[in-house]
């Protein structure tokens, strides 16, 4: 929805009652060098495998790789801005980092409602991130408290 007076897109949520088991949402992003620099700066995580091309070539990655938590942040972004959206409180994330994400990779993060619990409006999501080749690079679960309204 757009606020016609300001031209700003308004983010809307899906409340706990509007979420059904099996519902899902997806966010797609392509990793850029500036994403890695911004994430390293924001997190203070300046491991040379993520920021120094020479070091990365000599290390296990062979080239600069994204911070694993970049994918985790994509999932948090998806849950907090799209599904369920504003009012969502992250309770936990349990993720497995199954593959590397490199500059130029396009990652599709998908969250799917696995279970709802009326107590506290808790929702458990299955989370999967795949690259442009369909290779799973992250999987796991996230639990949130969804908004009541």
Language model features by range: what are they?
Residues 1-21, 101-149:
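HotDog/MaoC-like acyl-thioester-processing domains
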Residues 26-31, 96, 143-145:
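Generic structural detector for well-ordered beta-strands
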Residues 48, 84, 100, 146-147:
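Proline-rich low-complexity regions
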Residues 81-105:
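Mid-chain, well-packed structural core segment of small domains
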């Amino acid at each position: 929805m757009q606020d016609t007076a300001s031209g700003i897109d308004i983010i809307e949520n899906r409340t706990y009652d509007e979420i059904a088991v099996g519902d899902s949402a997806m966010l797609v992003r392509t990793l850029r060098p500036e994403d890695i620099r911004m994430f390293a700066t924001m997190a203070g995580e300046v491991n040379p495998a993520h920021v120094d091309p020479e070091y990365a070539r000599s290390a296990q990655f062979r080239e600069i790789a994204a911070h694993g938590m970049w994918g985790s942040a994509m999932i948090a972004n998806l849950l907090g801005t799209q599904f369920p959206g504003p009012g969502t409180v992250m309770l936990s994330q349990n993720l497995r980092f199954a593959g590397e994400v490199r500059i130029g990779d396009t990652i599709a993060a998908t969250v799917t409602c696995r279970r709802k619990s009326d107590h506290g409006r808790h929702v458990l999501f299955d989370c999967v991130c795949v690259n442009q080749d369909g290779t799973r690079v992250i999987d796991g679960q996230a639990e949130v408290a969804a908004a009541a309204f």
